[in-house]
Curated annotation (Swiss-Prot):
CDD domains: CSP_CDS. PANTHER family: COLD SHOCK DOMAIN CONTAINING PROTEINS. It comes from Escherichia coli (strain K12). GO terms for biological process: negative regulation of termination of DNA-templated transcription; regulation of gene expression; transcription antitermination. It is found in: Cytoplasm. This is Cold shock-like protein CspE. Its main location: cytoplasm.
Length: 69
């Protein structure tokens, strides 16, 4: 799987999900807190730059292996 870079569009900490806007201009990608690769509390900030992979889930594309840059 190839890594894609993008920016967090929004992330709801209480619900544990949000969306990432890929820098290549493609459609926003769903991100669940379980895909964030960090220790401790897994959250993302609006506008934060990230690197991730795209997987196809039951409800469409979603981010996997999300790493903050």
């Amino acid at each position: 799987m190839s890594k894609i870079k993008g920016n967090v569009k929004w992330f709801n900490e209480s619900k544990g999900f949000g969306f990432i806007t890929p820098e290549d201009g493609s459609k926003d990608v769903f991100v669940h807190f379980s895909a964030i690769q960090t220790n401790g509390f897994k959250t993302l900030a609006e506008g934060q730059r990230v690197e991730f992979e795209i997987t196809n889930g039951a409800k469409g594309p979603s981010a996997a292996n999300v790493i903050a840059l």
